[in-house]
Amino acid sequence: MSAQFITPKKRPHSPLDSNELLPSFEDPQDMINAVVSTLSAPEEKTNVSIAYANEKNQATEIQAYAKIAGKDWTFYVKSLAVSIGRNIELSAPSNTNITTPLIDIDLGPAKVVSRSHAAITYNLDLRCWELKVLGRNGARIDGQKVNVDSPNVNALHSGAILDIGGTQMMFILPDAPAVVAPKMLEKCLLRYKEQQQQQNKRISSGPGIGGSTSFQMFDKAHLTHSPSSISANSLQSNLDQDLSKEEAKDIKPPYSYATMITQAILSNPQGVMSLSEIYNWIADHYAYYKYSKTGWQNSIRHNLSLNKAFEKVPRRPNEPGKGMKWQISESYKEEFLNKISDGTISKTRRGSSVSRQLSLHLATHNQLPESHKYTMDQQIHNGTAASIPQQQKQQQQQQKRPPQQQNSQPHLSQPHYTIPSNPMQTNSMGYIPQSNIYNMSNSDRRYTPYQQSQNPLMYQHQQQHIGQTYNQLGRPQGQLGQPMMQPQQQSYTSSNIKTEPSSPKRNPSISNNTPKMAKGTVSTESHSRSTSYTTTQLHEMSNFNSSANDSTSTAPTASTTTNGDIGLNFASPKKITALEAYTPERGSKGNPSGTNNNNNTNNTNTNTTNNNNGKNTAGGPNTNQSSPAFWNFVQFSTPNGQSPVRKSSEEVGNNSPTLNRKIKRERENDETNSPFKKKQRTEMIDS
């Protein structure tokens, strides 16, 4: 009993349990090759090692159900039953009539193996491969003893290690990754490490084999390879073209899946390939896989997913195809280059299959594919793709600008600026205070929403003429932008009635007989959303010439001018100047002297205020217009984008329809309110 407790205490001191001493592999296939190279074999060469030596199978490998790999030989399973034993010697007397079939895997001439020692068969009921032991000495599967005529089913998995008569062999399936038992793996890797240390000592003490000619750019002291690696490199240079021909369809390439995947990815200048492109590259360069219908594609997918040397990368936007693309991991390449520069890559076995292909590519091309350019191009494309629709919209807006009106005054064009709707409140003049959300100071640039400026553009009261106004502001002469119009500013000619636009943007005609605003008079048009004036500033602004307005009315008795500040600088006011809400009962008859009495100090203009309410006194400015905020609301809320007070000019003439309607109401109100008119009507009725 005490011995049972002592044995576990000694095990941690054994080198088998020291994982730090075991070599590591990035490619699973390299690990399998390392394990196979350390499998035990008798001192006397067996017949199977001579008949199925790796040197012979390297050019004659064929499609098979499975393969059984020994230390230096490989047998391919082409039937559902494989016999293992010892064949009869050829020198034996042949006078007997008893004929025995030949053994598939001949482990002779050692007598420890029976003539019919074991068999590997496929169990159709359980759908698995199994080992049946027939010889008296039995066999082992992953170190576990299997006796003769065992009633249990000894199933074989991919990576199982068999031991029969002192000869170890590994059973490997083509469609399943090989999994080695942990206990067997530790033993094999320790042997592998010892073999590599002895081999390195022999190479360093001898003259040295040196690297192939393709590694001249590196130090030969760090490129000592085993003969197997040299033969693999020579095969890569000599058999690539031959293996792609149709007559080589029965020759399996001597490369692992990771090697072929790396070759395919490195063939792309950007180092990026999709899964289908990897399939096509392998099928085009190796006829064996082109004509093979087995699940080698599944093995490719497994290697891509499980191998840390490969990583996914998304496709570019609008790139045809589905799924992700694959590339060699940036961290893996960085680690590889660091090992190259430090000279530590030779301390490992030979590097993984991916590292070997990177070394070959680096030696022949002096650089690795720059896959980071693919991701950079993708990021640039994502950044610029969003700006392309905005540029197209701006170009379309330039092409859709209305033609300029022909008139004696300078041609004033109306640029198509996109004006977002103002958030309305119960008080129509209650603007949300924002500081200069629209920057119109530079007229040469197209309007860009939400571009703020620091200093608002203000009118100078010394400017008297339109030419001086626009030249000083840096705007081309003869062009004035007006994104939003007042109802009184609509003066359409007969030609404009037929081609009436459906959007709220207007292109009014310009008239010559525009009366100038008298000094000392202040019109409510001087207040807009783009400027904020105090009472003293309004007096200074009264000197501005009304000929600089975008649109004027043809009525000689009313001045319906509107400053062009909306097109120049569209900003919310910081201080609201009160405007009077005009109703039929509260007209402008109390303002005959031409001055504007703004009685609405509490900003009582609501959405019920109509544009055609109020009166106009001849000789003074027209103060009967609604607030700009209310007109903005009407413009952007009507379904067809038209003014709700507009009529065809054929009914009321070429004058402003709003003014005609107001003049009509003024006449009616004058007749109703005049005491003389009332007396006349009373006398007529009495008579």
Swiss-Prot record:
Q: Which GO terms describe its cellular component?
A: nucleus
Q: Which phenotype arises from disrupting this gene?
A: Forms constitutive pseudohyphae. Impairs ability to damage human epithelial or human endothelial cells in vitro.
Q: Name one GO molecular function term.
A: DNA-binding transcription factor activity, RNA polymerase II-specific
Biased region (Low complexity) positions are: 389-410, 472-490, 542-563, 589-624
What positions does the domain FHA occupy? 82-146
Q: Where is this motif: Nuclear localization signal?
A: 663-670
Bias class Polar residues marks the residues at: 226-241, 411-442, 491-540, 625-659
Q: What is this protein called?
A: Fork-head transcriptional regulator 2
- Supply the source organism for this entry: Candida albicans (strain SC5314 / ATCC MYA-2876) (Yeast)
Coding gene?
FKH2
